[in-house]
Amino acid sequence: MSSYLFTSESVSEGHPDKIADQISDAVLDEILKQDPKARVACETYVKTGMALVGGEITTSAWVDIENLTRKVICDIGYEHSEMGFDGHSCAVLNAIGKQSADINQGVDRENPLDQGAGDQGIMFGYATNETDVLMPAAITYAHRLMEKQAEVRKSGKLAWLRPDAKSQVTLKYEDNKIVGVDAVVLSTQHSEEVSQKDLHEGVMEEIIKPVLPSEWLSKETKFFINPTGRFVIGGPMGDCGLTGRKIIVDTYGGAARHGGGAFSGKDPSKVDRSAAYAARYVAKNIVAAGLADRCEIQLSYAIGVADPTSIMVETFGTGKVANELLVSLVREFFDLRPYGLIKMLDLIQPIYRETAAYGHFGREQFPWEKVDRAEDLRVAAGLK
């Protein structure tokens, strides 16, 4: 019998890097509302008392960058100097320029179906049947812990919580099946006055226990709640934040490979983002069809070229049909050209700010989480 541990982490919407991601995606959403053909690459930097928004944007839209940035920061919960960061009073600097014409000529075409990829690169998508959302369990529960932290903070149930937090979940596997939780780490920013006893009790009873399956917890499970003891200084006052610094949190928590490209602040013509979403869509439909228990897709592109330069399917020995057949089915049922996948997943809509915290995958409200091709794949593979 083989046994092993696997760990994934998540961070809250108030983590400095996630503040930056949410600002970048809020800018993208506001532009897409006005100009569906916009080209957006928006980067944000946050530090004590300031937010810098920059990047390359080509659009006919007008967005009030300063007020939008302040609103995002306040919505997260940084709206008073006691938090160490205040959306009402921080400086907001705008350093946005235009996209290079050299890139534009490779992307835009008279026939939209010939639209080239905005850059070269590799992208991965993954799915596994170990959770109901066909995502790895460790990252799924790490995200849910962070969502719960925000819920009880914003509702006032634990009024001493502050926006910055991190979680980490270590699961025990035997013969590739989860048998329990080995360890949970949860660090959360808090107000000055709360005692360590009240903090530990509140986090355990209101965040950890309601989220993790009780049958996975035992007297051997280790809990590390604010293990340094004090976490008053947090958010951008504690660390600077940058767009695109949490790419493993954003995806599969290390359970699958990553092509290296970040998502937030990029419009769907950037295959770093849109092709990674399409790869997840393909992998999830293959698993939902029962063609594999685990599936990883790799796509690659060349700048200015429409068709992917490669498609790879890996099922880790769990496939019900040959990987070569799966590759041919992917080519048959999924249009993975940049314009094709944008149409397939309806990506020209203002949905991106919501992706920028708690993971881009495993959340049913996003179009790349549909399993509408599963039945067709199953029939075509000869399993029905």
Curated annotation (Swiss-Prot):
Residues 99-109 are annotated as: Flexible loop. ATP binds at residues 15, 164-166, 230-231, 239, 245-246, 262, 266. The keyword tRNA processing does not apply. InterPro entries: ADOMET_SYNTHASE_CS, S-AdoMet_synt_C, S-AdoMet_synt_central, S-AdoMet_synt_N, S-AdoMet_synthetase, S-AdoMet_synthetase_sfam. It catalyses: L-methionine + ATP + H2O = S-adenosyl-L-methionine + phosphate + diphosphate. K(+) binds at residue 43. Its cofactor is Mg(2+); K(+). Its main location: cytoplasm. One of its GO terms (cellular component) is cytoplasm. Pathway: Amino-acid biosynthesis; S-adenosyl-L-methionine biosynthesis; S-adenosyl-L-methionine from L-methionine: step 1/1. Pfam families: S-AdoMet_synt_C, S-AdoMet_synt_M, S-AdoMet_synt_N. It is found in: Cytoplasm. One of its GO terms (biological process) is S-adenosylmethionine biosynthetic process. Binds 2 divalent ions per subunit. L-methionine binds at residues 56, 99, 239, 270. One of its GO terms (molecular function) is magnesium ion binding. The keyword Transferase applies. Mg(2+) binds at residue 17. Its EC number is 2.5.1.6. It is an enzyme of class 2 (transferase). Keywords: ATP-binding, Cytoplasm, Magnesium, Metal-binding, Nucleotide-binding, One-carbon metabolism, Potassium, Transferase. Belongs to the AdoMet synthase family. Homotetramer; dimer of dimers. Catalyzes the formation of S-adenosylmethionine (AdoMet) from methionine and ATP. The overall synthetic reaction is composed of two sequential steps, AdoMet formation and the subsequent tripolyphosphate hydrolysis which occurs prior to release of AdoMet from the enzyme. This is S-adenosylmethionine synthase.
